[in-house]
Amino acid sequence: MLAIYKKEVKSYFTTMTGYVFIAFLALVVGYVFYMINVKSSYAWIGKTLEYSYVSIVFMILVPVMTMKVFADERHTKTDQMLFTAPVTVGQIVWGKYLAILTVFLVNVLIICMYPLFMADYGEIPFLASYSAIGGFFLMGAVYFAVGLFISSITENQIISAVVTFAVILLSFMMQYMTGIVPSKPMPTAVVTAVFFVILAV
């Protein structure tokens, strides 16, 4: 697993993929942080991380990062080399997953410095801020896992990216969809059934 992890991390930083992901996400989060926390003197960084611009960029970057992790290897048939190597399927998956989380962790560590920067200008809710950052990391970990799973069941990178984007978009929309779900059991069951039928189609 360690060999796969090192290989994947190296591939992200010997190409532009890792650098573009880190730079683009850091740029957007940094801009929103400046506008909300610095310019508007808002102490809690969680407001920055839940902002729509950050969410939209995240929805785009995650599919781009995960679309070729397994799909490209299935398409080029190089996945057979992995499966014949002296490692288990679980070790392959974990190696690739931890590698992509390592790239994301660079952004999280950058964000961790923002509350410290704000501390020079007033009282900062550090516990709430770092809890929000931890939640942001866990959210990213879930979405990357979803992206890797979808990449593993298709050979087409575009399909992998589109489906991953759709799943993440749907998860973001869930909080707005709760208002249209009826409170009574039977109508709720009907709405839920229709929802899953649409997903199946």
Question: What do these predicted regions represent?
Answer:
Residues 58-64, 140-144, 193-201:
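Hydrophobic cores of alpha-helical transmembrane segments in multi-pass inner/ER membrane proteins
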Residues 29-36, 40-57, 94-95, 99-164, ...:
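Secretory targeting signals
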Residues 1-72:
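Hydrophobic alpha-helical transmembrane segments
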Residues 65-83, 97:
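Transmembrane helix boundary and interhelical loop/hinge segments in multi-pass membrane proteins
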Residues 157-201:
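Transmembrane helix segments
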